[in-house]
């Protein structure tokens, strides 16, 4: 048996044992796994994920620095699920959910289940009960860092019990994984970044709650604020970069940039302009943007305004972009790539 046949036999054996998509070629454009997904509210991120959105029946981790857009991205995913008639829940361990902002992002508050638990154990027990019901489509836990173990709450200020939160997360995820898969519920954990002390080489960044979530998550998204969107001197939004650090559904390491506008969420028209230029669908000549010889405007903001005022043209460009998703995904892969800044260091459990 030659090498290629031996390799094919090994690959088919792996797929029979562990399921289709358990091994793939990194450069493959095919959506190797037929899986139900929910849009993130960002066309570029849906394309970068390779399967058209975040997968159902899986654990997702969204992490990044403060005010980078983690909760916004989770709420936009909830809004997209609700548009399809899905039932969503929000476990607000931080006790910081702003209902006015959530409504502006398109979340139907009347049909959103919300819990503000007192302890980490209570939060994860509520999560487990909702997942086991099999009736919840998207469940968000905000955030892992706020899942404080009962022993820590009942103890004295200054008491330290090493690895308590990491053990809590590890036990909960072992219990949750099978239920999540059976119920087809998407569980999104929002996480924060901490700095490891005394790191000489590599990134000092790590995420809270130990290493268990890194292993159990099918998709990990690293979201960062990279700049401000200004109108004259006033800041009206954030320029945001999201990197797909881990992806079990399609090739990872793709990277996408978009604007998050205050009180609006992800700027869909801004994405159409940026992705259109990247795919060659929207032409850029100097400062002018045009589509099929029709001028959209001088400057990016004017082009965004034109598309906002002409929804039919915006839909036409979006359709063209979806048809060119494979080409755009290749560009994302060229821009992305594993680097030491993905927050996925070999950290020990959070103390």
From Swiss-Prot:
UniProt cross-references to PANTHER family, sorted A to Z: MITOCHONDRIAL DNA REPAIR PROTEIN RECA HOMOLOG-RELATED (PTHR45900:SF1), RECA (PTHR45900)
Keyword Cytoplasm: yes
One MF term in the entry's GO annotations: ATP binding
Stored CDD domains: RecA
Positions bound to ATP: 64-71
Organism: Rhizobium leguminosarum bv. viciae
Name of this chain's protein: Protein RecA
An annotated GO cellular component: cytosol
């Amino acid at each position: 048996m030659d090498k290629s046949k031996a390799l094919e036999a090994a690959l088919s054996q792996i797929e029979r044992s562990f399921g289709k998509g358990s091994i793939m070629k990194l450069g493959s454009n095919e959506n190797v796994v037929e899986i139900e997904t929910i849009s993130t509210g960002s066309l570029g991120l849906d394309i970068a994920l390779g399967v058209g959105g975040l997968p159902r029946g899986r654990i997702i981790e969204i992490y990044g620095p403060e005010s980078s857009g983690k909760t916004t991205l989770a709420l936009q995913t909830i809004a997209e699920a609700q548009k399809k008639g899905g039932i969503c829940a929000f476990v607000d361990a931080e006790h910081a959910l702003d209902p006015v902002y959530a409504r502006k992002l398109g979340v139907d508050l009347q049909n959103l289940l919300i819990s503000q638990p007192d302890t980490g154990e209570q939060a994860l027990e509520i999560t487990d009960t909702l997942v086991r019901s099999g009736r919840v489509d998207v469940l968000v836990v905000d955030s892992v860092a706020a899942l404080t173990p009962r022993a820590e709450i009942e103890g004295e200020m200054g008491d330290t019990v090493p690895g308590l939160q990491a053990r809590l997360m590890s036990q909960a995820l072992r219990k949750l994984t099978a239920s999540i898969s059976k119920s087809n519920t998407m569980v999104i954990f929002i996480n924060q970044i901490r700095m490891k002390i005394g790191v000489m080489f590599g990134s000092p960044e790590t995420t809270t709650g130990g290493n268990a979530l890194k292993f159990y998550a099918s998709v990990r998204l690293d979201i960062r604020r990279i700049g401000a969107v200004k109108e004259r001197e006033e800041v009206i939004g954030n320029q945001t970069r999201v990197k797909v650090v881990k992806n079990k559904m399609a090739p990872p390491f793709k990277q996408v940039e978009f604007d998050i506008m205050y009180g609006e969420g992800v700027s869909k028209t801004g994405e159409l302009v940026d992705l259109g230029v990247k795919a060659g669908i929207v032409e850029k000549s100097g400062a002018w943007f045009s589509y099929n010889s029709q001028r959209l405007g001088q400057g990016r903001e004017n082009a965004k305004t034109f598309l906002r005022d002409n929804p039919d043209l915006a839909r036409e460009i979006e359709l063209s972009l979806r048809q060119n998703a494979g080409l755009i995904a290749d560009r994302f892969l060229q821009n992305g790539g594993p680097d030491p800044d993905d927050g996925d260091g070999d950290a020990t459990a959070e103390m």
